[in-house]
Amino acid sequence: MPFLVALSGIISGVRDHSMTVRLDQQTRQRLQDIVKGGYRSANAAIVDAINKRWEALHDEQLDAAYAAAIHDNPAYPYESEAERSAARARRNARQQRSAQ
């Protein structure tokens, strides 16, 4: 029999959204274990899980965009290989001066 969890998001003391989630027994048990591990409520654990997954998705999207930029311009973030070489030469000279 499915287990229902009511979720409500509170932002600045104002109820933003609420929903009911249907969990199978295994997922319900996992949620209870997570809550016992230090969350103040099942709602807090679920909100945290959503936020962590969103951050991971966002990182994946940024990585994909970076890979596309590198594919289009192997010298990225520089406009050209000449600009990249000039920047490296300046950096190397600066490091040599500061090491002396």
Curated annotation (Swiss-Prot):
Disordered, as annotated region: 77-100
rRNA-binding is among the record's keywords: no
Keyword line: Toxin-antitoxin system
Keyword NADP: no
Recorded superkingdom: Bacteria
Assembly and interaction partners: Forms a complex with cognate toxin MazF4.
Function (record text): Antitoxin component of a type II toxin-antitoxin (TA) system. In M.smegmatis neutralizes the toxic effect of mRNA interferase MazF4, its cognate toxin, on growth.
Record's protein name: Probable antitoxin MazE4
Organism per entry: Mycobacterium tuberculosis (strain ATCC 25618 / H37Rv)
Gene of this entry: mazE4
